[in-house]
């Protein structure tokens, strides 16, 4: 397997919703995951967060079910490791308290830290300077899609 990258929903949703900013970079990353050039890891919350994002923009219900099924299949086939929230919970609580992040953002960052993977995100909260500095102190990088190209 290739480089270890942790993915959040702000990246993965671009695999399914066309016309998004940085769509080409997201699709390149998806191809890297499917081609085993990237060892992808995420929180199991990715499923819910991706569904929520698609519901929010009015994506058709049947298509949302397909997206969910596709993501479940990618994890069951080993293309993406979905880490249980409980495995990252203690670190996520520490992060949330230290950085005043949303719970889901804290879980994504904690997952990246415990797996020693670079976190790829388009989430502005996770790209804040203090969050990036915290991640560096924890031994990982936080990258935008533009910075994470294979």
At which residue positions do the language-model features occur?
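Short, well-structured N-terminal submotif of metal-dependent ribonuclease cores
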Residues: 1-42, 56-66
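Acidic, PIN/NYN-like endoribonuclease modules and their adjacent C-terminal/linker elements
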Residues: 2-4, 78-81, 109, 113-150
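Alpha-helix capping/helix-boundary segments
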Residues: 11-12, 46-47, 88, 107-108, ...
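Acidic catalytic patch
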Residues: 44-46, 72-98
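A short acidic, often aromatic-flanked loop/helix-cap motif at beta-alpha or helix-coil junctions
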Residues: 48-49, 88-90, 145-150
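Helix-adjacent hinge/juxtasegments
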Residues: 54-83
